[in-house]
Structures are given as structure tokens and as C-alpha cells.
Amino acid sequence: MTRWLALLLFGCALAWCGASRAQTCTATPSNLDFGNVNPIAGTAVARTGTINITCNWTLISLQPNALVCLNLSTATTRAMANGASTMQYGLFQDAGNTQTWGSTVSGNTPISVSIAKPLIGTAGNATVNYYGQITAGQTTVPTTGNASTVYSQSFNAETVLAYGYYLLTAPSCASLSSAGSFPFTVSATVTNNCNISATNLSFGTAGLIGAGINATSSLSVTCTNNDAWRISINGGGSGNVAARVMQRTGGGGSVNYQLYTDSARTLAWGDGTGGTTRATGTGTGLAQGVTVYGRVPSQTTPRPGSYGDTVTATIEF
């Protein structure tokens, strides 16, 4: 009887050792996609990712708690890339984007969570958030090929999963050894965008129109860096880009005029029809000034009064 009992206890001891080695934790993060990003807006863009964590216990365990530490190394300021172009961002542990997600190796704080063994079953789960924010003010981030451009950064070896099981007092993250990785990718799609504004063009006051009258105004164009743009100006009230007309306020007269893309006033600015051309350029991510050259040609002087026209500038990109 005694011999049988000794064998039974020895068998249980072997079973306990094997089960102890089966206690493991895993971490599965979601990729973080910032979606479409308009760099010329110059604003920060924030998104949230999740990490699903599962810890397993033996059926009978003297360590009913597990501390899981998610280490992320590399620089505090991170950068997504497309070729040689980059876009800076940060990864954080809090929604306020103040606590950087780091690693014990680099002296920063990893994301950590404690999970308790459930009363029923042997697997405990937890979900934690991580937060990303694209740094504001990166207005010169370019696109390529005049198309939306994906920037990304992948994490693999930079991620270190560490965990430890305990009874009452949790170990420190720094004391735990690496037990694997949790790869994920951060990405954003930089889109082409343009903003345009205009100042009015005034030919001033004239008694007679015996000679041509010149004047200029300007457009301010801000387009995504490396994105080609093209500006058309419609025919205004006449509806004819090749023969623009200012009308007298109250009626009873008109003045012919034209707009040009060049200072010599040889290239009429329109929509590409009727012998007209359009202004073209490439965005820099910063405001670009585009001059509008106007001329009232010599013509029969109309009735005195105030003459004007309204035209619309349209930018394509």
C-alpha cells in the first residue's frame, strides 16, 4: 500500500512539471491604419489600435496571475516611409498621446497588463489599446506619380513579448525575459489635395481707352508636394474665354478685356479652348503665388461708369 502511494505521488509531480511548462501568453495586435491623410492641412491625425492578449494556465496552478509586457523599441519619434520620403508619427499608451510606447531595453515604459486566471476554464483574455498620432505641420510630405501614396512602417524584431506568472506580487517588466514577438504594421495613405484663393484684379480709373491698360492680380495655390496642378479660368459673364467682357453697372455699356498667363500678355488664360491656355505647375506643399495678367485693349471709350465681370478659377490636380 505504501509503495503504491509513493508511485502515485511521483506521477502527480511529473504531471505538474509538464503542465507548468504549458503556461504561456500570446499577443495579437491589429495593424494601425491612419487612412487618408491630407498633408497640406498641417493637422495631427490620430488613430487607435488594439492588442488581444491570451494567457493559459494549468488546471491547477499556484500562480493565478500573469503580467504581460509589450515592449516596442526603436526611436521615440517614428517614421512611415515610401521610398526615401518619410512621415513622422508617434505611438503611445494613452489617448492623450503623452506616454510613449517604449521598451525596458531603451529605458522607456512598455505597455503592460495583468490577467487573472478565470474561475472557470484555463484561459484569460484582455484587450488593450495603443494610440498613434501623425505629427502636425508636415505639409511637404509628397505623393508619387500624381496618385495617392501609401506610407508604412512594419514592426517585427522591434517587438518583444515578455510575461511572468505570479501568486501575489507581480514581477517588474525589466526582470522578464523575451518570450516572442507580436508583429504589426502602421500605414497611412497620403492624398493629393489643393487649396486656391484669389485677389481681385482692378484696372483702375481711365478717362479714355486710347491705349491698352494693364493690371495684375494673384492666385494663391497650395497643393500636395510633387502633385501636378492645372488652373482654368472661365469666360465670366460672356461665357467666352476668348472674348471676355466687363459690363457697366446698371447696363448701357461694356468693355472688352482679356486675362493672360504670361507678362507679355500673349497667352490668353482660359480653359484650353478657343486658343486659350491654362496655368500649370507642381505642388510643393507650401503656398505658391500665380500671377494673373490682365489687359484692356485699345477700344472705343464707352459711357462713364463702373464696369466689372466675375470669373471663376478652377484647379485640377
Please name every model-derived segment.
Residues 6-15:
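Bacterial N-terminal signal peptides
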Residues 21-81, 124-125, 129, 134-251, ...:
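N-terminal small/polar-rich segments of proteins
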Residues 69-73, 90-94, 102, 234, ...:
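Predominantly extracellular/luminal cell-surface or secreted proteins
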Residues 76-124:
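A surface-exposed loop-and-adjacent beta-strand signature within N-terminal beta-sandwich domains
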Residues 114-120, 277-282, 298:
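Beta-strand-rich interaction surfaces with strong enrichment in secreted/lumenal proteins
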Residues 260-262, 267, 272-277:
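Outer membrane beta-barrel transmembrane domains
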